[in-house]
């Protein structure tokens, strides 16, 4: 692994509490990344809300912050530490979402922080349902019919056009949390409300079900 001479200090976002879909594998990979980057001579600043991790061992990073994983707190750390780069993808969905928010609010540009390990537009294409559809269309890949909704009423109208059952897919959630397969308006109203709340951007894709297709 070659060293980039334009980067001296790297901010790494941890994954926070261990939950289903975002467990100890992120702690392990984050720890290994810290060790590898330190070996190359980079200064490592780590922020994680979970103190009960290997990653937050005092010897893992040069500076460790046990702080809530939110945009305001991350901006404070960036302002104080002035990292050259942000490595978000070792923090699971939490890290990716925070990276997107920091970019959207202009915080990364404000402090001259470049994102490494993953491109911000790649996060958007993978997490934002509209951008994902655009990418698939540009590649000529067929998908099930779908439309994006930002309210329960919009989702109900889309489902009426597509026909039940439909699949609800919230944007920017871990493992599709908050979504599901629904068979009627009552189920859709309940699941969609949950999905909109879970989504970082309040967005749910309403997609025709291909259940039983071969």
Q: What are these model-predicted stretches?
A:
Residues 1-214:
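N-terminal beta-alpha lobe that positions the nucleotide/phosphoryl donor
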């Amino acid at each position: 692994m070659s060293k980039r001479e334009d980067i001296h200090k790297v901010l790494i976002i941890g994954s926070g509490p261990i939950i289903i879909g975002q467990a100890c594998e992120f702690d392990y990979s984050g720890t290994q990344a810290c060790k590898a980057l330190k070996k190359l001579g980079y200064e490592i600043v780590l922020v994680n809300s979970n103190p009960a991790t290997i990653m937050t061992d005092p010897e893992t990073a040069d500076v460790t912050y046990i702080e809530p994983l939110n945009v305001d707190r991350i901006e404070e750390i960036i302002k104080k530490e002035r990292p050259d780069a942000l490595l978000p993808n070792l923090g699971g969905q939490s890290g990716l979402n925070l990276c997107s928010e920091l970019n959207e609010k202009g915080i990364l540009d404000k402090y001259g922080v470049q994102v490494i390990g993953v491109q911000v537009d790649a996060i958007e294409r993978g997490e934002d349902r509209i951008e994902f559809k655009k990418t698939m269309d540009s590649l000529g890949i067929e998908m099930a019919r779908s439309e994006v909704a930002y309210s329960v009423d919009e989702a109900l109208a889309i489902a009426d056009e597509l026909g039940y059952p439909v699949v609800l897919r919230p944007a920017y959630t871990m493992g599709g949390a908050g979504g599901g397969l629904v068979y009627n308006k009552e189920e859709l109203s309940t699941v969609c409300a949950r999905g909109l709340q879970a989504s970082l951007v309040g967005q749910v894709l309403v997609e025709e079900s291909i259940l039983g297709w071969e």
